[in-house]
């Protein structure tokens, strides 16, 4: 710390918040390249893999989109992953409070749950994008509560959009299609079913394209030793 201050810098100028994995550096460099040059350059991933067309290794480029947007607007530096994740979650919590309007007791309970959920704080303070999708989860939950109180077509569309985008980034989000699809069918009957089916098919199609062109599987899974 003293050495960096000697040269007029702070530790934040030379330190990338990281956890136990090497993902953080790879994510950071991919976003840096996209923000500055329009496309990730080089070979990335645990085994330096490359997709058929684009160099995103085992990670879907959809994961990086919120950070890319942040980098284009505010710039991209070593602390940008943490700062942006904190801001995204602050915005999500503010929207949640504004649309759900929880009581003081409910607010304390909700914030208490977040406080004791260690992975939430941990991902906020490292270079992993999971905190962004936790923010989407908070927003999704708030919109779901609003829809349960008063079904609205715009809210339903927002819910589908969140699940579609998040599924492209983290496939486990696909489970939430069942929740939103149920909303659609309950309100619009067969039209809701068609809407949900279209959303699922579109997401699967885009994900298949990403998997074939942008990403590559782990090398060790195809090598026998």
Residue ranges and their predicted role:
Residues 96-118, 135:
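Transmembrane-helix signature of polytopic, membrane-embedded enzymes
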Residues 189-225:
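Membrane-lumen/periplasm interface segments of specific transmembrane helices
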Residues 51-57, 61-68, 73-91:
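Loop-to-helix entry region of an early transmembrane alpha helix in multi-pass inner-membrane enzymes
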Residues 125-133:
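Short acidic/glycine- and proline-prone juxtamembrane loop motifs at membrane-interface regions
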Residues 146-151, 175-201:
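Perimembrane helix-loop-helix junctions
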Residues 101-104, 140-156, 166:
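Membrane-interface transmembrane helices that cradle and orient dolichyl/undecaprenyl
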Residues 155-170, 177-182, 200-202:
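Membrane-interface alpha helices of multi-pass inner-membrane proteins
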Residues 5-15, 19-53, 62:
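Extracytosolic helix-loop segments that constitute the early lumenal/periplasmic catalytic or substrate-binding loops
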């Amino acid at each position: 710390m003293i050495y960096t201050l000697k040269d007029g810098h702070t530790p934040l100028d030379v330190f990338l918040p990281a956890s136990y994995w090497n993902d953080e550096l790879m994510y950071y460099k991919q976003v840096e390249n996209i923000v500055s040059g329009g496309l990730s350059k080089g070979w990335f991933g645990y085994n330096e893999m490359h997709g058929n067309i684009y160099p995103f290794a085992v990670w879907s480029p959809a994961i990086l989109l919120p950070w890319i947007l942040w980098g284009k607007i505010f710039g991209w530096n070593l602390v940008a992953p943490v700062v942006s994740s904190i801001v995204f979650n602050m915005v999500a919590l503010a929207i949640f409070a504004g649309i759900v309007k929880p009581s003081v007791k409910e607010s304390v309970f909700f914030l208490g749950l977040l406080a004791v959920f260690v992975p939430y704080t941990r991902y906020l303070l490292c270079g992993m994008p999971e905190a962004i999708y936790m923010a989407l989860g908070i927003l999704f939950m708030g919109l779901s509560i609003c829809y349960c109180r008063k079904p609205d077509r715009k809210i339903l569309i927002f819910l589908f959009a969140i699940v579609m985008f998040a599924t492209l980034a983290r496939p486990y989000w696909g489970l939430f299609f069942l929740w939103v699809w149920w909303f659609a069918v309950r309100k619009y009957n067969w039209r809701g079913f068609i809407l949900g089916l279209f959303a699922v098919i579109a997401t699967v199609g885009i994900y298949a394209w990403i998997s074939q062109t942008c990403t590559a599987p782990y090398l060790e899974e195809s090598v026998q030793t």
